[in-house]
């Protein structure tokens, strides 16, 4: 397994302005902005204004359903159904066309993730959670540490994803090797909100939930969260650390919009 590791270094404003070829006036203006923000108490004073936009590393914490963890098994019989026992295989034998990225196979991929009891870890997209990958994610997103014990007990050694990672993992799936190869096949590494916005930017269909057609493989969106519509009123979503990948009824989940994903071919 290859792990992509990205290191973020402290910002050097002078070096950044040199790289961007700022002239003297632009340097003065940018320097004033930088000092105002970073050398004042503004960030601390107004931090509450930004709390709503801070990602929830535990997943869709707005869910009000069952609180028991669902790491595979027969499901709880509630509105959030867990999948089957853990299975790390990816089977594309039932895909309609593995050589394209299409809505029917996206739905089949999502259903398989549910049936195979995939787990949830922020920043993952369907690969098997190894010790090295978990350590990297703990470094990358320290807030995950609050759920480390649960992740180790339930998800280590199993395939994991976050909400929009379920879509990206399908997009990055290599049909020849059955590996999930990061940032391939034209599928961008967007978060949930950015992925939904891309529908408008690329001219694909999107709207509020009252107009949603019954087409499998549609993207479902609400602020900070993503799901895949699989037909008959159901969605598959990587709900959160305590739930993993589950099946839920679309109605009553608070979805704000649907879209045809620009990077998926729709054969209605």
Regions found by a protein language model. Give the residues of each.
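N-terminal capping segments
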Residues: 66-73, 77-179, 223-225, 236-238
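Generic alpha-helical secondary structure signal
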Residues: 24, 44, 101-108, 193
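Surface-exposed intrinsically disordered loops and tails
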Residues: 128-153, 179-211, 266
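Catalytic Cys-His active-site segments of thiol-dependent hydrolases/isopeptidases
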Residues: 222, 228-252
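Low-complexity, Gly/Ser/Thr/Pro-rich intrinsically disordered linker/tail segments
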Residues: 253-268
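Short, hydrophobic/aromatic-rich segments at coil-to-beta transitions
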Residues: 212-219
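Cell-wall glycan-active module
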Residues: 1-97
């Amino acid at each position: 397994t290859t792990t992509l590791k990205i290191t973020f270094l402290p910002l050097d404003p002078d070096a950044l302005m040199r790289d961007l070829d700022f002239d003297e006036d632009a340097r003065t203006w940018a320097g004033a902005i930088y000092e105002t923000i970073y050398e004042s108490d503004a960030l601390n004073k107004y931090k509450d204004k930004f709390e709503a936009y801070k990602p929830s590393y535990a997943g869709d914490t707005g869910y009000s359903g069952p609180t028991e963890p669902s790491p595979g098994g027969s499901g709880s019989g509630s509105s959030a159904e867990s999948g089957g026992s853990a299975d790390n295989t990816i089977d594309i034998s039932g895909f309609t066309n593995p050589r394209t990225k299409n809505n029917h196979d996206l739905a089949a991929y999502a259903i398989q993730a549910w049936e195979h009891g995939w787990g949830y870890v922020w920043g993952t997209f369907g690969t098997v959670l190894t010790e090295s990958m978990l350590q990297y994610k703990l470094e990358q997103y320290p807030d995950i540490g609050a759920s480390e014990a649960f992740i180790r007990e339930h998800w280590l050694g199993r395939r994991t994803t976050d909400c929009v990672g379920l879509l990206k993992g399908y997009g990055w799936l290599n049909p020849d090797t059955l590996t999930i190869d990061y940032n391939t096949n034209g599928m961008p590494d967007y978060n949930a909100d950015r992925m939904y916005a891309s529908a408008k930017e690329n001219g694909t269909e999107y709207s509020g939930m009252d107009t949603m057609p019954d087409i499998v493989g549609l993207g479902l969106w609400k602020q900070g969260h993503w799901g895949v519509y699989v037909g008959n009123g159901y969605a598959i979503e990587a709900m959160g650390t305590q739930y993993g990948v589950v099946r839920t009824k679309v109605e009553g989940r608070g979805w704000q919009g649907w879209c045809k994903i620009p990077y998926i071919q729709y054969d209605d």
